[in-house]
Amino acid sequence: FVFNSGARYNPTTDTWTPMSTVNAPSKYAHSAVWTGTEMIVWGGINSLTPLTPTNIGAKYNPISDTWTIISLSNAPNSTAYHSAVWTGDAMIIHGGINNNTTKKYNPITDTWTTLTHSGVVRFLHSAIWTGNKMIVWGGTNSINSPIMGINTGGVYNATSNTWSTTTLVNAPTPRVSNSAVWTGSEMIIWGGMHEDVVNNTGARYNPTSNAWINTTATNSPSARSSHSSIWTGSEQIIWGGGDNNTSFNDGKKYNPISNGYLPAVNINMYLYSKN
């Protein structure tokens, strides 16, 4: 099934509020970013028989509980498993199945702008925004099974509209469906899958020095992919995900200063997005 429903969660009251489905697009394997006032969803798959990527997007306003379809003029090709980052004033869409473009969407003017592309086709990759650059890494360039990951990456400079490559020296092994967070000075890559084998390794990338440092595997979470990961301001929290047989309801906290892991409190919740 492909759904067009959702809900807003209030952590203060611990309550859920259903969202309007009027003009809400049905999809999965899409992207979503938060602008500060609205959520923008874009792309994804809107039909399972056959699998049909789309280039339809919409903006959701939680105050008015309304959806607004965004412009298709100069929009990226229909795609899924792409990446999206919010720059502070625009959403950048990169890659995806059948899409070798990089484009920027301005929600104020409802317009798309074509950006320079990295020249590397990739999907099921990760992407982060540093404040002035977008770093994309990993993923795959083939839909063949088992999925073979890549361990290349690119750094997009929004000011100069140019790309540079991330070094392969000490880079993590090839993978798809890994997590990535930005610490303020480094991107931390962790987990993922390559040829149906999940892993529990990671690395920190410094875009200033273009250098990788491997993160410890001691006491790390069990090998997994399609998990969630956030940066708290001092630690990376890894949660959920799964391997080929099991979904997980556990996680750990990683401290880059000590290069160590600590347990995260368990909850009775399995969070796993199987790609």
Residues covered by each model-derived region:
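Kelch-like beta-propeller repeat domains
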Residues: 1-275
